[in-house]
Amino acid sequence: VTNVDWFFISHRLPIALNAIQQGYEVYLLSRDTGRKQFLQGKGIRFIDIPFDRSGSNPLHELKCIFQLYTNYKKYRPNIIHHVTLKAALLGSVAAKLSGQHHVVNAISGLGYNFTNGRNGILQKLIRTLIRIAFKSKSFSFILQNPDDVGMIKGFNLVPSSHIFLIKGSGVDLNEFVFSQAPGKTQLKVLFPARILLDKGVMEFIDAAKLLQKRFIGKVKFILAGDCDKENLAVLGEEKLRSLLVDDYIEWIGYQAQMFPIYTDSDIVVLPSYREGLPKSL
């Protein structure tokens, strides 16, 4: 269960395919953005759940919980694997209501809302929801950074033996193979991520601006990623464009094939908040 199909393909598809090879039936409950047929062709049973990643409408969230509950009751899965915070929160509530106990909540990062100094109404609401949804002796957590482990342990939600720390989601080394640095006269520094505050986009741009007088013409800072408008931490496209500098800070948008971008870069930077080892690094 995850918010959106493209994230599943990017971060969890190999796990699902391996489970199918071992004889499991794999159902994906996610929002369909056009990848349903592709995933069904891989042997995955796709159920469309209209998750809203911005989460601004409580009635819509209740609708998603009800749809998850209905499917959990109907299919009685042996294991429910929630991926991302939103899916884990809504899915855990649905799992409790449907009597499902074998739940794994895999959260790659609690994100910008849990960085130091952020303690507003939204943060307090999310913490309250975490305490309600995740409290269960039978639930397990897979987390990717020590800060999140400390937070979940501090809530006393599950036994400590049910909390696992991993270093990242991993990459396919058959696709991303070693290559020599380009060795060009103009150094290229790459930011390979969505244009989000919790990915450190402003830190990247600010660092580039600090070096501008010394290195313009010698270095190019490149941002490769889309402005994820559904994410609360997005830096808007208009604001981003106002920060670009010709032939120095460049935005190339979403790139379906990242390997050529990596091989053409000398340095890769991702100053993100509350992540483990990001897949892009």
What are these model-predicted stretches?
Residues 225, 234-253:
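Nucleotide-activated donor-binding/catalytic signature segment of Leloir-type glycosyltransferases, i.e.
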Residues 180-199, 204-209, 221-222:
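Conserved donor-binding/catalytic core segment of Leloir-type glycosyltransferases
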Residues 15-22, 66-69, 123-142:
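Membrane-proximal helix-turn-helix segments that form the acceptor-binding/catalytic region
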Residues 254, 273:
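Aromatic "clamp/platform" in nucleotide-sugar-dependent glycosyltransferases that forms part
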Residues 82-88, 107:
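Short His-centered aromatic/hydrophobic patch
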Residues 2-59, 151, 165, 227-229:
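N-terminal strand-loop element at the rim of the active site
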Residues 47-48, 127-178, 188-191:
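Donor nucleotide-sugar binding/catalytic pocket of nucleotide-sugar-dependent glycosyltransferases
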Residues 268-269:
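A short hydrophobic beta-strand element within the catalytic core of glycosyltransferases
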